[in-house]
């Protein structure tokens, strides 16, 4: 049993007029707000902490990120207990295809929501196991022993072609015209250590400040909102959302 210390923040930034990011912070949806809580893993057989960075015109990105996180929360709550890791992966794959169809269908019905989509990155605790998941270019970092490591791989042209000027063009998401969305998933239960910090973020953080700066903030015990503030002070050209998960 571990104690989880969680902080979450989602900010509009300096340039955008609306916030298309959203965070699901254990028991709270967070958008243009901050939140903090603590809980014991033994008090629940499952929980999810996730972040979605929406995209699309006419505020459709707000709808996509909200719909996906709301759907994920209900899906995880309805999962039967004690699925094996393989069965859990299969259920998550079925969920991804279902929610991708749902988001895409909304775009077909309402032209203002055409091509809307969202990234998704998150940590799930289920059946005494930890999993991380990723679809898009939002990130999961781990800070341990004064070192920051990116656990997820960006699904973007910067990784496909090595062309840095296209780093903001993603190659995978939920909705957004992606007919064959996929999700990286990894079970990392045996690699979770007391003292670890796990940082979920939208690209509004890592586009504004370097990994070295993120590591410096983590070393100081910065909250999610303090990390958002650093990105906003550096320019804040995009929405910025962060979750900091500390394992005790």
PLM regions and their residue ranges:
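PP2C/PPM-type serine/threonine phosphatase catalytic domain
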Residues: 1-248
């Amino acid at each position: 049993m571990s104690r989880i210390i969680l902080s979450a923040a989602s900010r509009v930034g300096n340039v955008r007029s609306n916030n298309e990011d959203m965070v699901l912070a254990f028991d709270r949806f967070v958008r243009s707000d901050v939140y903090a809580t603590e809980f014991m893993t033994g008090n629940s057989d499952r929980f999810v902490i996730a972040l979605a960075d929406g995209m699309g015109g006419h505020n459709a990105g707000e709808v996509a990120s909200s719909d996906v996180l709301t759907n994920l929360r209900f899906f995880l709550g309805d999962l039967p207990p004690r699925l094996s890791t393989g069965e859990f992966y299969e259920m998550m794959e079925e969920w991804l295809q279902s929610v991708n169809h749902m988001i895409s269908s909304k775009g077909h019905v309402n032209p203002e929501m055409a091509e809307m989509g969202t990234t998704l990155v998150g940590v799930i605790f289920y059946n005494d196991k930890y999993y991380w998941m990723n679809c898009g270019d939002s990130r999961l970092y781990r800070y341990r022993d004064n070192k920051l490591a990116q656990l997820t791989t960006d699904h973007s042209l910067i990784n496909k072609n090595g062309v840095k000027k296209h780093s903001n063009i993603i190659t995978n998401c939920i909705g957004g015209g992606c007919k064959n969305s996929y999700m990286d998933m990894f079970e990392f239960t045996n690699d979770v250590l007391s003292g670890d910090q796990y940082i979920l973020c939208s690209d509004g953080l890592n586009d504004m400040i370097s990994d070295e700066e993120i590591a410096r903030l983590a070393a100081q015990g910065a909250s999610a909102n303090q990390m958002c503030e650093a990105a906003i002070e550096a320019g804040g050209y995009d929405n910025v959302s962060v979750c900091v998960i500390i394992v005790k």
